[in-house]
Amino acid sequence: MVKYFGDIRPLAGGLKKEEWRHPEPEVGALLRALGKRHEPLEKRLWEGNQLSSTIIILVNGRSIDFLNGIETPLRPDDIVDVFPVEAGG
C-alpha cells in the first residue's frame, strides 16, 4: 500500500492511499511506476535521476535514508508513505 500526505495528495489525484497490485522490487521502481500513473506526482518526486530533496519516503515507518535509499527492496505487504518536506521557522 502507498499512502500520500500533505500537498502530495493532490498530485496523486487526491488519493489518501492506494493499493499497489503490481509489486515492484524496490522503492525507486515503485516511485517511477507511480509517477507514470500520476504525472504531476512524477515531476515532484524526481530531480533528474535523483529523488527530490522535497520528498520523504518511509517504508513500514522507516526512512529510506536509513535503509538502502531508492534501492530499498519491497515486499508485497510493505507500506510506503510519501511525505512532503515541510518548511518551518
Give residue spans per PLM region.
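Ubiquitin-like/PB1-type beta-grasp interaction modules and other compact soluble beta-rich domains
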Residues: 1-88
